[in-house]
């Protein structure tokens, strides 16, 4: 199974990939990776036809553990799929790190 880090994912041309957010819909509405589509992990098998086969599909969940099963399902159906290491939490850590760096550089302590 292929994997990708959040840093690698964010460097890709978003028009050439599909990011599948497999977290529950309520978690997705609170925030997700830019451009991600919401298909909860329990629905991937029945809804995978919504995903374009001509683009690689990168799958995330909260931590990058539960999404592994969805990657295997997609691969078995002929998709070029990979798991996003660390899931949505890795995205949040990256964004927080960027904010702290900005805050430390600018001295701006206001949110």
Predicted regions and their residues:
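Short, surface-exposed ligand- or partner-binding patches at beta-edge/loop junctions that are enriched
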Residues: 60-61
